[in-house]
């Protein structure tokens, strides 16, 4: 069974799956480990499951044990990993592409609706106990009959 180091705490279902598939080393306290700690914890491992909070720069990658064959990034991108340094060490790097595409679109719609209906102002007013009715209080913009286009930028 392949041994992997998982740098950050995952949801229970993911940790259970990792336990069935691999011999995992978990970061049970979900601490943001230093680069030297990541190097130390990955000794004897075949792979590392990083998150976007882990800086895997050239110096860190160059110091990883020779047993490391893969860095899997628990993120959509690779901004935290020096891909060229990994390539020079023949370390495969993967990510989780498109896993957040639908969620990102949904949050975009949420933000549009919240802005049009002045949701943040309403929440703040309710928290402060300042909810004062009037015909035009926090009326916002009604979207019924509005044509809306959403363009992706990623």
Regions found by a protein language model. Name each.
Residues 6, 148-150:
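Hydrophobic Val/Ile/Leu positions in short beta-strands of Rossmann-like dinucleotide-binding domains
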